[in-house]
Amino acid sequence: DVDRSRGLGDVYKRQAMRCSIYSCERSMAVMEEFARAEIPKGGVTEDDVWAVLHAENIKRGGEWIETRLLTSGPRTNPWFQECGPRIISENEILAFDTDLIGPYGICADLSRTWWIGDSLAPANMRESYAEAVEHIRYNTRLLKPGLHMEDLTHSLHVLQDKYQALKYSSPMHGVGMCDEWPLIAYPDRLVKNAFDAVLEPGLTLCVEALVGEVNGDHMVKLEDQGVVTNNGYETISTYPLDERLFSN
């Protein structure tokens, strides 16, 4: 059907997606450079930082950004608050989800969380970040052609109890010209037979995590994008993790 076809696409779509992701990550790098250089000077707002991503996307032939999901400090929790005029301080957390329509009209849907400061982030934030990294890495290792989507749901990494209430709406979703078919649900949100299909080579998927506690002082948002291959899954996005929050 149309949804499945959009999710799978063809070799040309996947080539365009690689271009869009590359462009997005170069734009993210400029945004990070701006944030780390300018926030410590004072007076830089969430909107100021987000505007850099917009400008860099347009410079590289991109089209638009669907959301305003960049927040800082305590405004990261709960997630889904839009960026605004809040001034970001040094030694604060900053998290974002690009939701970016880049070159060729293809979505680059990546998320990163940064600690804006020279020292290590606080221990509770590093714990959340490590949990988010493990969630994505574990779930990515599950991906292979022929795996039924409901079986995938029941095989997912389980977040710690304290992170369950605020976990993301889904750990994986299709991606193309925007968020696409399918949606891989968590077990407690599974609608039986809603996605009665198996993973196929060429299916483009985002794998993500949202980690934080109810009434906590932060949320960590991470998301990568890639494609199911003939023998597994290739993560196309390569933007580095923040070593102030995590080290391998």
Locate the predicted segments by residue.
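Extended C-terminal subregions enriched in glycine
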Residues: 128-169
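Generic secondary-structure signature for well-ordered alpha-helical cores
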Residues: 22-36, 54-62, 137, 141, ...
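Flexible, glycine/charged-enriched surface loops at secondary-structure junctions
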Residues: 43, 62-68, 107, 146-151, ...
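Single conserved hydrophobic/aromatic residue that forms the stacking wall/gate
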Residues: 1-12
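Amphipathic alpha-helical segments
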Residues: 13-25
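Charged, cofactor-coupling segments
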Residues: 88-137, 179-248
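Conserved short loop/turn motifs at secondary-structure junctions
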Residues: 10, 34-46, 142-149
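Short catalytic-site patches enriched in acidic/histidine residues
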Residues: 14, 33, 40-123, 175-194
